[in-house]
Amino acid sequence: MMRTQCLLGLRTFVAFAAKLWSFFIYLLRRQIRTVIQYQTVRYDILPLSPLSRNRLAQVKRKILVLDLDETLIHSHHDGVLRPTVRPGTPPDFILKVVIDKHPVRFFVHKRPHVDFFLEVVSQWYELVVFTASMEIYGSAVADKLDNSRSILKRRYYRQHCTLELGSYIKDLSVVHSDLSSIVILDNSPGAYRSHPDNAIPIKSWFSDPSDTALLNLLPMLDALRFTADVRSVLSRNLHQHRLW
């Protein structure tokens, strides 16, 4: 009898210790992600010279169109864990939305350095969100990324896309009629099929905590705002992913 009680007590202790260890690992991974997110971030925004200020004053302020999924964030919903997300990786935030009268929870992971990226480029461009996702989901994600900064006020969703052969195409003329001043950042070449000369390609992101793709784009985006027509630069086969 005593032996049975000892075994039960030992099993209870082992189960409790396992749960405690899992919780510790969860907290450790979350802390590591936070450190990685911010430890290498640096991009010096130096004051413009009089010549640069004059040059910038002669061109229109550009519009940077931003995709969400696999460009700025990655998400998965209840019961679905894609193999690209490491088990136990904590989400940055959880969204609860109702789709077709069914409540769904989305676990959202932010691409490394996305907050810093948005903070910097919002000083250079008018930012516009254009996602092929449903508005009820895309709007909630954009709200979280905006974080009350009012930098992601203009938004376009699935209903603003064109469906062609099973793919959602983003028509940039919906955003602005002057395509010389629009840049789109999207991981899906099919999304900007109609405007390849306005696109900056970026690799799809799912879970790599060491990813620096957004940081790597800052020098280019900094320079691109001085051009009279962004297509004069972006038309040089960048949409073929040869340089990325």
UniProtKB/Swiss-Prot annotation:
The gene is Ctdnep1. It is a single-pass membrane protein. GO terms for cellular component: cytoplasm; endoplasmic reticulum membrane; lipid droplet; Nem1-Spo7 phosphatase complex; nuclear envelope; nuclear membrane; nucleus. Residues 57-224 form the FCP1 homology domain. Its main location: endoplasmic reticulum. It catalyses: O-phospho-L-seryl-[protein] + H2O = L-seryl-[protein] + phosphate; O-phospho-L-threonyl-[protein] + H2O = L-threonyl-[protein] + phosphate. Muscle specific with lower expression in other metabolic tissues. Serine/threonine protein phosphatase forming with CNEP1R1 an active phosphatase complex that dephosphorylates and may activate LPIN1 and LPIN2. LPIN1 and LPIN2 are phosphatidate phosphatases that catalyze the conversion of phosphatidic acid to diacylglycerol and control the metabolism of fatty acids at different levels. May indirectly modulate the lipid composition of nuclear and/or endoplasmic reticulum membranes and be required for proper nuclear membrane morphology and/or dynamics. May also indirectly regulate the production of lipid droplets and triacylglycerol. It comes from the Eukaryota. This is CTD nuclear envelope phosphatase 1. NCBIfam families: HIF-SF_euk (TIGR02251). One of its GO terms (biological process) is positive regulation of triglyceride biosynthetic process. CDD domains: HAD_FCP1-like (cd07521). Pfam families: NIF. InterPro entries: Dullard_phosphatase, FCP1_dom, HAD-like_sf, HAD_sf, TIM50. It is found in: Endoplasmic reticulum membrane; Nucleus membrane. Belongs to the dullard family. Its EC number is 3.1.3.16. It comes from Mus musculus (Mouse). The chain crosses the membrane at residues 7-29. Interacts with CNEP1R1; the complex dephosphorylates LPIN1 and LPIN2. GO terms for molecular function: phosphoprotein phosphatase activity; protein serine/threonine phosphatase activity. Keywords: Endoplasmic reticulum, Hydrolase, Membrane, Nucleus, Protein phosphatase, Transmembrane, Transmembrane helix.
